[in-house]
């Protein structure tokens, strides 16, 4: 077998012809990495306790422990945690309605210190108690990134939230009517109080904590220990003045004078006037002053008045403070200063342009005196009404920003903070320091002064992703915090009452927090399981909603918009339509998270305009520093950029630049879109809105009975099918040993088995399992016995996959033409043949549940003995009263018989007599059996019976357990058979030709052992042979031991399985027995079903037309589906037309290959044709020479139905390539027979009803069409009588409540307009809420009369009651 090919076992069966022009430097990464890695890091289950990193569960424990008692003499210390094995596997949890979880046990030490000898510095240990304590159950992730909670599969969606750190922004001039920009800053911790700084329109700077009342920022600066002098020194530069007897002198600083207007004549040292009064001072003037050696300039007295002092002014003799820092100079103050003999004074230098006096003004408005007063002011703001004692004040201030218990910036926050305030290090303390607050205020003042830039909060460098692990850790922490409080209270008692750790710790808070999160959080969602794509997309979703995120109502347009940093990180296309648009996004194909939780995307390094194979992952912040070329930039064969100007991105803008400036290049053209969008062929030719619909609707495609690969794909089909986990892939390579519809057994290659492991892999396939959306999950083997498979090869197909590729719909022969108005407004016309061939038939599985409860009147019973039912109605039930598997059932049929005791009723004499005669007890119970719903027909495919512990099982339950055990035993026997065969093969090789010291069948000493002898001895007696060579004897012994060990472990596994199955089931309170019945319902295509292509071209089936009436081609081929051509131009999704053309070529080439096979052409001819197709028609070339003749024949057989093409997104087939494919598919004679035109894109069609040709050629071809999960069967609904609302007595609404059709206000107007008064009266009374009237109508219809007596509608009585409740009495007069 030619194994040296680059193709896997399944790829060899059918190679997709790709039109991609770019070489693939980096394959698509595993698509569920984000979910799985995050949770692995959270649990660190397989890491030895000593080597665990402080993250996830470990971090949660480390943050809560050690707990010290109030008196300090008892301490609870955490050592390590470990996790138990889960009691049930995923399959069992789904069946039993349990959560797939593992128990966490923490090893804790309680240390009690000796009171007498311990001091606060050195404590003496009195005793240590160590114990493992149960700490709740943590849900485990399944192999495919989901969780099983209470039996249903759920996904925890990742959250995109604002990164912790510091942000500077302005209000864009919206707050104040003048349009002035008000700047603000906000320090956001991971947990703890937010600290905001903001300017008001008067340019005073305020701060607020947790959005409370605002206070001048200088209060905070005083509270962190700065006095007014220090505050001013931090924010201003000073002007130095010397006081003279009259006037003063100012120190000359050239930069501060330049550009100002002189308020007096400026003179130099010699007294010469350099600048006259009211003239502007220029650089020439300042140079002249410098040249003359002037260091001080004479200024008049009034130049000083109004200046602000920078320092306190103290009388040197008396020590009295004459003026305080930040006081304004006045004439009287100047006089005082002169009197005190003070010569030198320092004033703040401010100007209007770039040195505002903001902090000085703020300080002036602040009335607090010192540090304590400032802290008291903050205390009053945080705790209004509480008396501020000094201890309480200091404690509160420290807890706000300085305590690690209440404030945590997190590593990310510290890194972002340091980067923003311009520090070089990314490390630092997780609480705020005084420098931090000061730096933020400085930057904010600089911004107001016009220096620096504000942050863009929608930039992905300022938004980070919180994954499952992190969200779960936060919940576990909150549970531990509650435990910590409780333990702290009780630790004091531990030393007196000799308590152990488990007496103090109650794990309920942890369990409650986790249960609430996994069961009811906004981010824990019921998994969308319609098809493999919907699963994978759900797990890759990133939501801005959820706790700690945005809300739909408050989110504006900016947050929802596509941002330049989304490139390669978040898909710009795939997002829901409606209120959540832009808030829920999908991860791009290659995106991943870095250690801080920011999204990164890969780029290829470019050095000297040559592209290297080095790949770097860049976050949004790093990306801004580089010039990055697009993936489609032209390269020569050595990887050098060849264009003179290359289109590139630089700091968020698209530019054309020279190749030398390029530093990185995109990895692949598909890099910018998500999985769903990358599955849309010719996406680049579709309008963005339609592409969005196309990507979203693929997730709603229902798996059909026989999936068919898309003729036109994009090359992502295989990856998405494999990563979704729908298909079965081989864990290890080997040979297929056994195969049937339920299981595949593979004998693993020797090279891939580790010593002590069993060399057998058994894959149990899923058969007819119900998905969350009631679609059918079903796996089919695609390997044969004896096939050689490699690790990772697909060995079984699942729902919506075809030979390991995603296949969501069917390829349909489409004609774009109108047809009698049946395709008006996007309606779809379909041929009857499509329905007859079951092309769109899907299987839906419904789960029906019945519970037998314990009631006040006695317990309910599941039984076949049901009152008032004929034998015929009970025909499908077995002796236990449960329906047989395989029974076909219709609406109203009994599935599970159940009777409920009813209260004693007074009996008539006749009944008493009958009872006395027959001892009849049947009348005490009423029939509450489980019946099939209205409108449901199906086949029973599975029944499960759950019985509470201590209640005897019925025969059916016992039989189900026996079948399950039989299946399990079969698996074990298979494994054992292969292991034994392998062992005996090894023994035969070991012993053949060796000398023996004796053995069974009187083997003489010194006789050589040959194969004939071995064949004559029973294999199990080979172990009794005694080889002469000790080494061989030892090897024989070790094989024997390992076989025995394997047998023993299998027996243990079987015993464990039996114990699991035979123990009682956990059922809800009061439930004794529960039966689940699964019905498979076949849904054929019918008018009213919604269908769609992959380009947002959706419609509803309007009519199913007989084959003979459909338009047909010259050779008699009828079309499958007729679409309206008007649906294309206005919607601008031209991709669908290109898909149709390429699909048409795919089918034609397939038919040509089929003809070659049919004519039994030489294999060389087939190879030649395939070579022309794959290697001589553009796109990627394939190495077909490595395939054997048998493989080529098998591949050709698979291709005969149609050749699958791949046109990758943004790198797809060109128009010329499509035309070339058309000509390869339809040579002249075939084209003529089909009535095609010269370009092969259109054909002359004939009307099926008349046989006449249509007057114009019609575009025909193959399109991949999906049937969506909006089926008319689920929506159609009719009611005659049914339930009514309790208060208004009007019929309920909606199918689920079996409600009526609402006859609304506007419909009433319509009847009024026609004067149909009696119809209207009926609608408002007897058909709605006239209780007596509707009963009478029912009676009269039964009697065959047709009179109607309308009475008082109940809603009128409700209105009267409501008016009375307002205190207005209304009485109705009767006439």
UniProtKB/Swiss-Prot annotation:
The keyword Transferase applies. It comes from the Bacteria. One of its GO terms (cellular component) is DNA-directed RNA polymerase complex. It catalyses: RNA(n) + a ribonucleoside 5'-triphosphate = RNA(n+1) + diphosphate. GO terms for molecular function: DNA binding; DNA-directed RNA polymerase activity; ribonucleoside binding. Keywords: DNA-directed RNA polymerase, Nucleotidyltransferase, Transcription, Transferase. InterPro entries: DNA-dir_RNA_pol_bsu_ext_1_sf, DNA-dir_RNA_pol_bsu_external_1, DNA-dir_RNA_pol_su2, DNA-dir_RNAP_su2_dom, DNA-dir_RNAP_su2_hyb_sf, RNA_pol_bsu_bac, RNA_pol_bsu_CS, RNA_pol_bsu_protrusion. Pfam families: RNA_pol_Rpb2_1 (PF04563), RNA_pol_Rpb2_2 (PF04561), RNA_pol_Rpb2_3 (PF04565), RNA_pol_Rpb2_45 (PF10385), RNA_pol_Rpb2_6 (PF00562), RNA_pol_Rpb2_7 (PF04560). GO terms for biological process: DNA-templated transcription. CDD domains: RNA_pol_B_RPB2. Belongs to the RNA polymerase beta chain family. The RNAP catalytic core consists of 2 alpha, 1 beta, 1 beta' and 1 omega subunit. When a sigma factor is associated with the core the holoenzyme is formed, which can initiate transcription. DNA-dependent RNA polymerase catalyzes the transcription of DNA into RNA using the four ribonucleoside triphosphates as substrates. PANTHER family: DNA-DIRECTED RNA POLYMERASE I SUBUNIT 2. This is DNA-directed RNA polymerase subunit beta. It comes from Methylibium petroleiphilum (strain ATCC BAA-1232 / LMG 22953 / PM1).
């Amino acid at each position: 077998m030619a194994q040296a090919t680059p193709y896997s076992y399944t790829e060899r069966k059918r190679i997709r012809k790709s039109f991609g022009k770019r070489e693939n430097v980096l394959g698509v990464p595993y698509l569920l990495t984000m979910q799985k890695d995050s949770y692995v890091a959270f649990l660190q289950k397989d890491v030895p306790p000593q080597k665990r990193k402080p993250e996830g569960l470990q971090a949660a424990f480390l943050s809560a422990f050690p707990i010290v008692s109030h008196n300090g003499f008892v301490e609870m210390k955490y050592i390590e945690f470990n996790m138990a094995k889960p009691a049930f596997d995923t399959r069992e949890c789904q069946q039993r309605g349990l959560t797939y979880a593992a128990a966490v046990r923490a090893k804790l030490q309680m240390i009690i210190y000796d009171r007498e000898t311990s001091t606060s510095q050195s404590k003496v240990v009195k005793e240590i108690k160590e114990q493992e304590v149960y700490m709740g159950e943590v849900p485990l992730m399944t192999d495919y990134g989901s969780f099983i909670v209470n039996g249903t599969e759920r996904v925890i969606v990742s959250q995109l939230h604002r990164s912790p750190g510091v942000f500077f922004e302005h209000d864009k001039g919206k707050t104040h009517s003048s349009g002035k920009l008000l700047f603000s800053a906000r320090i956001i911790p991971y947990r703890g109080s937010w600290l905001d700084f903001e300017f008001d329109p008067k340019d005073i700077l305020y701060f607020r904590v947790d959005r409370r009342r605002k206070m001048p920022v200088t209060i905070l600066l005083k509270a962190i220990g700065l006095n007014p002098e220090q505050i001013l020194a931090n924010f201003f530069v000073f002007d130095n003045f010397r006081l003279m007897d009259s006037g003063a002198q100012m120190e000359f600083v050239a930069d501060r004078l330049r550009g100002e207007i002189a308020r007096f004549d400026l003179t130099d040292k010699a007294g010469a006037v350099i600048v006259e009064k009211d003239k502007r001072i220029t650089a020439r003037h300042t140079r002249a002053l410098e040249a003359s050696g002037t260091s001080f300039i004479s200024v008049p007295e009034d130049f000083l008045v109004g200046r602000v002092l920078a320092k306190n002014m103290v009388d040197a003799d008396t020590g009295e403070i004459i003026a305080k820092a930040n006081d304004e100079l006045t004439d009287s103050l100047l006089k005082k200063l002169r009197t005190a003999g003070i010569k030198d004074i320092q004033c703040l230098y401010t100007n209007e342009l770039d040195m505002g006096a903001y902090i000085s003004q703020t300080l002036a408005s602040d009335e607090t005196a010192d540090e304590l007063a400032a802290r008291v002011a903050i205390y009053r703001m945080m705790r209004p009404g509480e008396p501020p004692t000094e201890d309480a004040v200091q404690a509160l201030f420290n807890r706000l920003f300085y305590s690690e218990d209440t404030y945590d910036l997190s590593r990310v926050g510290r890194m972002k903070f340091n980067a923003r305030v311009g520090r070089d290090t990314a490390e630092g303390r997780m609480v705020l320091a005084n420098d931090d607050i000061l730096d933020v205020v400085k930057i904010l003042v600089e911004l107001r002064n016009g220096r620096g830039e504000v942050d863009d909060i929608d930039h992905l460098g300022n938004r980070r992703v919180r994954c499952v692990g992190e969200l779960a850790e936060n919940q576990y922490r909150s549970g531990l915090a509650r435990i910590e409080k409780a333990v702290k209270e009780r630790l004091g008692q531990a030393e007196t009452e000799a308590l152990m750790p488990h007496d103090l710790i109650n794990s309920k808070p942890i369990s409650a927090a986790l249960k609430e999160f996994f069961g009811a959080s906004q981010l824990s969602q019921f998994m969308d399981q319609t098809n493999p794509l919907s699963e994978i997309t759900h797990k890759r979703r990133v939501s801005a909603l959820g706790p700690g995120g945005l809300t739909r109502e408050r989110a504006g347009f900016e947050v929802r918009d596509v941002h330049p940093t989304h490139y390669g990180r978040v898909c710009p296309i795939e997002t829901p339509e409606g209120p959540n648009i832009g808030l829920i996004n999908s991860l791009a194909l290659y995106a991943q998270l870095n250690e801080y939780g920011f999204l990164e995307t890969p780029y290829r390094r470019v050095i000297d305009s040559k592209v290297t194979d080095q790949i770097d992952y860049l976050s949004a912040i790093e990306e801004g520093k580089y010039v990055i070329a697009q993936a489609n930039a032209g390269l020569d064969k050595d990887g050098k950029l060849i264009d003179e100007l290359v289109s590139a991105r630089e700091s968020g803008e698209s530019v054309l630049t020279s190749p030398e400036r390029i530093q990185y290049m995109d990895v692949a053209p598909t890099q910018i879109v998500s999985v769903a969008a990358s599955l849309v062929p010719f996406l680049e030719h579709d309008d963005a809105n339609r592409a969005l619909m196309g990507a979203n609707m693929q997730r709603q495609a229902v798996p059909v009975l026989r999936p068919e690969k898309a003729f036109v794909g994009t090359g992502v089909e295989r990856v998405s099918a494999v990563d979704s986990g729908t298909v079965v892939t081989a864990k290890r390579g080997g040979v297929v040993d056994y195969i049937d519809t339920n299981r595949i057994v593979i004998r693993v290659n020797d090279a891939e088995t580790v010593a002590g492991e069993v060399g057998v892999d058994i894959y149990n396939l899923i058969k007819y399992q119900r998905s969350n959306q009631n679609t059918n999950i079903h796996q089919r083997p695609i390997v044969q016995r004896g096939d050689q498979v490699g690790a990772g090869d697909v060995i079984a197909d699942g729902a919506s996959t075809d030979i390991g590729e995603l296949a969501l719909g069917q390829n349909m022969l489409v004609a774009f033409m109108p047809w009698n108005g049946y395709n008006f407004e996007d309606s779809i016309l379909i041929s009857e043949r499509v329905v007859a061939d079951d092309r769109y038939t899907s299987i839906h599985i419904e789960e029906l549940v019945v519970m037998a409860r314990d009631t006040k009147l006695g317990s309910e019973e599941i039984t076949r003995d049901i009152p008032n039912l004929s034998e015929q109605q009970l025909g499908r039930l077995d002796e236990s009263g449960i329906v047989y598997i395989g029974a076909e059932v219709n609406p109203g049929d009994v599935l599970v018989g159940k009777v409920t005791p009813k209260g004693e009723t007074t009996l008539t004499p006749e009944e008493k007599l009958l009872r006395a005669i027959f001892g009849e007890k049947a009348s005490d119970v009423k029939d509450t059996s489980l019946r099939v719903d209205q409108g449901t027909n199906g086949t029973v495919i599975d029944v499960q019976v759950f019985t509470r512990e201590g209640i005897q099982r019925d025969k059916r339950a016992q039989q189900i357990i026996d079948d399950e055990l039989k299946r399990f035993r079969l698996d074990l026997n298979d494994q054992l058979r292969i292991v034994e065969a392998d062992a005996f093969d090894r023994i035969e090789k070991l012993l053949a030709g060796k000398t023996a010291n004796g053995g069974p069948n009187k083997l003489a000493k010194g006789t050589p052992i040959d194969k004939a002898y071995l064949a004559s001895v029973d294999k199990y007696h080979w172990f009794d042979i005694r080889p002469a060579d000790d080494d061989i004897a030892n090897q024989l012994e070790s094989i024997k031991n390992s076989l025995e060990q394997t047998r023993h472990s299998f027996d243990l596994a079987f015993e464990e399985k039996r114990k699991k199955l035979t123990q009682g089931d956990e059922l809800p309170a009061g439930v004794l027995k529960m039966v689940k019945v699964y019905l498979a319902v076949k849904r054929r295509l019918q008018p009213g079903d919604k269908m769609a292509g992959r380009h947002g071209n959706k419609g509803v089936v309007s009519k199913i037309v007989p084959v003979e009436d459909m338009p047909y081609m010259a050779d008699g081929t009828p079309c499958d589906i007729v679409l309206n051509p008007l649906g294309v131009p206005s919607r601008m999704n031209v991709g669908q037309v290109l898909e149709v053309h390429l699909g048409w070529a795919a089918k034609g080439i397939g038919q040509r290959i089929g003809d070659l096979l049919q004519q039994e052409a030489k294999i060389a001819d087939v190879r030649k044709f395939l070579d022309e197709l794959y290697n001589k028609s553009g796109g990627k070339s394939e190495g077909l020479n490595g395939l054997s003749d048998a493989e080529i024949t098998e591949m050709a057989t698979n291709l005969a139905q149609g050749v699958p093409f791949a046109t990758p997104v943004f790198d797809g087939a060109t128009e010329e390539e499509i035309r070339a494919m058309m000509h390869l598919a339809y040579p002249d004679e075939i084209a003529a027979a089909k009535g095609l035109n010269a370009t092969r894109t259109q054909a002359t069609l004939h009307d099926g009803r008349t046989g006449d040709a249509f007057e114009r050629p019609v575009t025909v071809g193959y399109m991949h069409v999906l049937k969506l999960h909006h089926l008319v069967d689920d929506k159609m609904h009719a009611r005659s009588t049914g339930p009514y609302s309790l208060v208004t007595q009007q019929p309920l609404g909606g199918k689920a409540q079996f409600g009526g059709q609402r006859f609304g206000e506007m419909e009433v107007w319509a009847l009024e307009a026609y004067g149909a008064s009696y119809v209207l009266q009926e609608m408002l009374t007897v058909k709605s809420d006239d209780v007596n009237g509707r009963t009478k109508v029912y009676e009269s219809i039964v009697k065959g009369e047709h009179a109607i007596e309308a009475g008082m509608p109940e809603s009128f009585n409700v209105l009267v009651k409501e008016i009375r409740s307002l205190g207005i009495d209304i009485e109705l007069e009767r006439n």
